[in-house]
Amino acid sequence: MNGPDDLSGPLDRAQLLRSLGVTAAALGIPASADAGAAPGSGFLEPHPRWRFVFVNHATTNPFFVPARYGIQDACKHYGTTYQWSGSRRSDVGEMVAAMRRAIDGRADGIAVSVIDRTAFNEPTAEALRLGIPVVSYNADGGLGNTRLAYVGQDLYQSGLKFGARIVELVRDGDVFLFIATPGQLNIQPRVDGALDAIKDSGKAIRVTVVATGTGVAEERTRIEATYQRHKNLRGMFAVDGGSTQGVADVVRKHRLRGRGVRAGGYDLLPRTLRSIADGHLDFTIDQQPYLQGFLPIFQLFLARYTGGLVAPADTNTGLHFVTRRNVRPYLTTRTRYEGSSRIHKYPVS
């Protein structure tokens, strides 16, 4: 039975206010924290040095380098700390265990990539019952999960635009879509959107979805094997960074662009960008991972700092097609915002 403090259903702002207020009182945190915690900066008054925990599905994946720089920059700016945890290979059990450790350790906020439709629902509800704000980032479980907000790309809409671009590039024939981990919510919605867009186009494009795995070498091997079995294919596209790099490598190795094969994918791995500049890939899609690190810290901080008056809000980090026409700045700029440098520098160059 739902009571006034039951957070298992959709969370409204009043519940968040009550939850954060009760937690602060229980922990003995005064409304105006003493200066022994985090110093004030700019508009901020001194406040506790809150600890926010990120639960990630690919902790060592280079895609998340700029995301972690975003986390670090936000923590420095707002006087907070963070912990990076989860799984290296999208193991949902490992991720749930990491989330439970964060709850047991009374983290001040949790950001989790919700790659499974149900596995994170109960720990999310438990965290909220304890007054720990939870946001999802990079991947979202949708309405079945009571997280406060999602920060990341609208993955299905991204897939629709991805599919529309494939339809522009390929007239007919066999197209292969490569995905590291079918069914997981950080990438499966892109495949779903692409399939719908291709179907709605009415073109005689035959699509086959191929699972590639979570290791870069494994992904390339499976993409190579697919090409060897289907040398008359007309397109090779991928919905994750590792598979996109694998597509780029195979297209380059066999000089497939000269045979009319079109190719593209997601994310900004260096070999992917170089392959675009060299004409082997048609495009890749930037989803701004720096923001997927910075903004969860910003939103969790404000939820704490305002006692819940400013609640986390859904934020779409966007979709930007990177092509041969606009790839140069990605290759020549060294910046934390794209993960190509550790150094803070302005102007960016």
Task: Give the label of every model feature segment.
Residues 1-12, 24-26:
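N-terminal secretory signal peptides
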Residues 8-17, 31, 35:
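Twin-arginine (Tat) signal peptide motif
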Residues 38-48, 186, 197-201, 294-349:
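Hinge/cleft segment of the Venus flytrap/periplasmic-binding protein
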Residues 45, 95, 151-175, 189, ...:
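Hydrophobic alpha-helical segments within soluble ligand-binding/sensing domains
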Residues 49-74, 78, 82-97, 105, ...:
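Extracytoplasmic "Venus flytrap"
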Residues 63-80, 158-162, 185-205, 218, ...:
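Short, solvent-exposed amphipathic alpha-helices that sit
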Residues 112-128, 194, 208, 212-275:
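Hydrophobic alpha-helical
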Residues 118-157, 168-170, 269-277, 281-282, ...:
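Flexible loop/hinge segments that line or gate small-molecule binding clefts
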